[in-house]
Curated annotation (Swiss-Prot):
Composition-biased stretches (Low complexity): 1-19, 77-88, 401-413
Coiled-coil regions listed: 301-332, 681-782
Keyword Transmembrane helix: no
GO CC, any one term: stress fiber
Modified positions (Phosphothreonine) in chain numbering: 560
Record-given protein name: Protein phosphatase 1 regulatory subunit 12C
Native organism: Mus musculus (Mouse)
Top-level taxon of origin: Eukaryota
Sites bearing N-acetylserine, chain numbering: 2
């Protein structure tokens, strides 16, 4: 049965197989017919994905597929008969494929060095790849190998002509990027062998830019040279890299500070981004806009490094201030100019304070030549202009008395080297001696200050304008004698000064400054006109009010004034040497020769000031003369009262004024004289002891006050120290908290680094898969 079934089954199986083959052939014929036929409008096939030749070559080299890379180079080579290969300016297509880069400027040779693939490096170098090709940051393949520490690749590149002096955009050589000692030793040995100057290599780019800029300046033309890819100018490069001298030359040649590159960056954007402070200052000084915007709408401060943020804010403020100054100067330029003559005119002396008047008088004395006549105050270059516009530019004493200027140009003027002759040998003239009748009538109605004969040079208007101002000065008894005392006493030799010292003069005596004579007036005439030097009084105060005020002041002084121990001793010395009342007065006690204390009003009231000089022969006048003589002879006879008179403790008693102290000294002299005549001195001893006890208690109080202040300071310091100690635990707790926070941050960063390593591995895997996919697609597309 098997033999019968075998022949029957064999033909059936063969027929089935033949039918299957026939169907397969039919399918192939139909598929070929459809593939060869043109597709219809609705049956168009999808376009095949095709990458650029450079991207395919980079992918093949990154994947290590050297056969595929070799086929691409062979396909790109046009052959010996093509015209492109014969042109030396145009690189061959195979060379263009070899040196092709991605968006970051990384070539296949860069990528092979990064991947440490020495086989691909050798293949590319043998095929003619550029060994010193730089990426967008200026890194060559040797920079990459040195940074990664690949000794074999570095040796191979150096053996095939790699430039060891190449500088990247940060100004670093491959030696500066070496990570290992072996790599550093290799590069140093190669530098020594080639004799490369490292510093000169780093300055090569700057020197080249400087040379080109000078050539442009000498040629008179500044070309608009731009980078073909970024559009950056020479000023952009110099600003970004800090080539200050190149920037100065470019700006001197008129280079625009608002030039834009491809991204809309100005040179100031580049300098701020790279943190070049000197470049930022230089560009800001030449009008670089702080508000210039890029194509992305960013200002220089938005792109700036953190180190130059404060500098940019300062430069922006300076630009704003300079702009405001220019606008203000332009506005002032349109206004009318002030006459230059008014800039040197001196203001009126009546508007100055007493201290300023004295300073002005000192300056005028220094300018005045010795022994020459003429006015002591006034600039010779101003002439009549100053006299016409400022008639009151006349040095005045503190109480308003005019300085000695004679109206007669022929009268002699004594030099400043002989002050004693002015004080003792000259007589005073009346203030109305040189005035006309009309002017004399006008000045009689004014209760202000009467001026000397020199005032005839002044105008009536300025006189009436100045005297009410001086009359408004309130002469209070509490007014201290200012610094003109020291100036007045310094101008007189001590050996010739027989006048009453300021602290020892009677309040009733009026000290008058000497005035140069215009005529030989007799002594009696000067006495009659003595009231012309009186202090100005207030117009609104009546005579009865002045008398009542003076009486109240005298009563208050007698009841409230205290006397120091020094004053008491001084009074005892003076009282011990009081001469007999029948002794005649000295000739120097003539009231007309007695100098007046400036700025001090007679506290006895106007009744004594207005007493006629004819009554000076009465008992009261004789007694006043004897008192003045006693006080004058005190310092002259060798008493040691000078230091006590000038000591600050004795200048004022219990806050009193100089005038009050003079009254106290006069009363003290009288009382001590009476006590000296009395045989019983018990009251004086008791008063002295009480006074000493009072002084001792006062000193103890002062020491206690100082001690209390010191204790307060020490208490404050202790409190602050305790507060610092109390705050220390809180500071330690804060430091511990910050330390824990930093530790947590470090742990998080470590975790992120681990995750970054995983991501890097995944990225590499995806890149490999992408390269394989590109190769598959390229093969299928063929």
């Amino acid at each position: 049965m098997s033999g019968e079934d075998g022949p029957a089954a064999g033909p059936g199986a063969a027929a089935a197989a033949a039918a299957a083959r026939e169907r397969r052939q039919e399918q192939l014929r139909q598929w070929g017919a459809r593939a060869g036929a043109d597709p219809g409008p609705g049956e168009r096939r999808a376009r095949t994905v095709r990458f650029e030749r450079a991207a395919e070559f980079l992918a093949a080299c990154a994947g290590g597929d050297l056969d595929e890379a070799r086929l691409m180079l062979r396909a790109a080579d046009p052959g010996p008969g093509s015209g492109a290969a014969s042109d030396p300016a145009v690189p061959p297509p195979a060379r263009a494929v070899l040196d092709s880069t991605n968006a970051d400027g990384i070539s296949a040779l860069h990528q092979a060095c990064i991947d440490e693939n020495l086989e691909v490096v050798r293949f590319l170098v043998e095929q003619g790849a550029t060994v010193n090709q730089a990426d967008n940051e200026g890194w060559t393949p040797l920079h990459v190998a040195a940074s990664c520490g690949y000794l074999d690749i570095a040796r191979y590149l150096l053996s095939h002509g790699a430039n060891i002096a190449a500088v990247n955009s940060d100004g670093d050589l491959p030696l500066d990027l070496a990570e290992s000692d072996a790599m550093e030793g290799l590069l140093k040995a190669e530098i020594t062998r080639r004799g490369v100057d490292v510093e000169a290599a780093k300055r090569a780019e700057e020197e080249l830019l400087l040379h080109d800029t000078r050539c442009w300046l000498n040629g008179g033309a500044m070309p608009e040279a731009r980078h073909p890819r970024t559009g950056a100018s020479a000023l952009h490069v110099a600003a970004a890299k800090g080539y200050i001298e190149v920037m100065r030359l470019l700006l001197q040649a008129g280079y625009d500070t608002e030039l834009r590159d491809g991204d809309g960056w100005t040179p100031l954007h580049a300098a701020a981004h790279w943190g070049v402070e000197d470049a930022c200052r230089l560009l800001a000084e030449h009008g670089g806009g702080m508000d210039s915007l890029t194509h992305a709408g960013q200002r220089p401060c938005d792109l700036a490094d953190e180190d130059v943020m404060n500098l940019l804010e300062e430069l922006a403020q300076k630009q704003e201030d300079l702009r405001n100054q220019k606008e203000g100067s332009q506005g002032r330029g349109q206004e009318s100019q002030v006459p230059s003559s008014s800039k040197h005119r001196r203001s009126s002396v009546c508007r100055l304070s007493s201290r300023e008047k004295i300073s002005l008088q000192d300056l005028s004395k220094e300018r005045r030549p010795g022994g020459a006549g003429g006015p002591p105050i006034g600039d010779e270059d101003e002439g009549g202009e100053a006299s016409a516009e400022h008639p009151a530019v006349e040095p005045r004493a503190l109480n308003g008395v005019s300085s000695p200027v004679s109206s007669n140009p022929k009268s002699p003027v004594l030099p400043e080297e002989a002050p004693f002759s002015r004080r003792f040998g000259l007589q005073k003239t009346g203030s109305t001696g040189a005035l006309g009748p009309s002017e004399r009538r006008a000045t009689e109605g004014v209760l202000g200050l009467q001026r000397s004969a020199s005032s005839s040079l002044l105008e009536k208007a300025s006189t009436q304008a100045r005297e009410p101002r001086l009359a408004r000065i309130t002469p209070t008894p509490a007014q201290k004698v200012p610094e003109p005392f020291t100036l007045y006493e310094a101008a007189t030799p001590p050996s010739l000064d027989h006048s009453v010292p300021p602290s020892r003069r009677e309040p009733g005596s009026i000290v008058k400054p000497n005035v140069l004579t215009a005529s030989a007036a007799p002594l009696a005439d000067s006495r009659d006109r003595r009231r012309s030097y009186q202090m100005p009084v207030r117009d609104e105060e009546s005579e009865s009010q002045r008398k009542a005020r003076s009486r109240l002041m005298r009563q208050s002084r007698r009841s409230t004034q205290g006397v120091t121990l020094t004053d008491l001793k001084e009074a005892e010395k003076v009282a011990g040497k009081v001469p007999e009342p029948e002794q005649p007065a000295l000739p120097s006690l003539d009231p007309s020769r007695r100098p007046r204390v400036p700025g001090v009003e007679n506290a006895e009231g106007p009744a004594q000031r207005e007493a006629p000089e004819g009554q000076g022969q009465g008992p009261q006048a004789a007694r006043e003369h004897r008192k003045a003589g006693h006080e004058r002879r005190g310092p002259a006879e060798g008493e040691e009262a000078g230091p006590a008179e000038r000591s600050p403790e004795c200048s004022t008693v219990d806050g009193g004024s100089q005038v009050r102290r003079q009254h106290s000294q006069r009363d003290l002299v009288l009382e001590s004289k009476q006590e000296h005549e009395e045989p019983d001195g018990g009251f004086r001893k008791m008063y002295t002891e009480l006074r000493r006890e009072n002084e001792r208690l006062r000193e103890a109080l002062t020491e206690t006050t100082l001690r209390l202040a010191q204790l307060k300071v020490e208490l404050e310091r202790a409190t602050q120290r305790q507060e610092r100690f109390a705050e220390r635990p809180a500071l330690l707790e804060l430091e511990r908290f910050e330390r824990r926070a930093l530790e947590r941050k470090a742990a998080e960063l470590e975790e992120e680094l681990k995750a970054l390593s995983d991501l890097r591995a995944d990225n590499q895997r995806l890149k490999d898969e992408n390269a394989a996919l590109i190769r598959v697609i390229s093969k299928l597309s063929k």
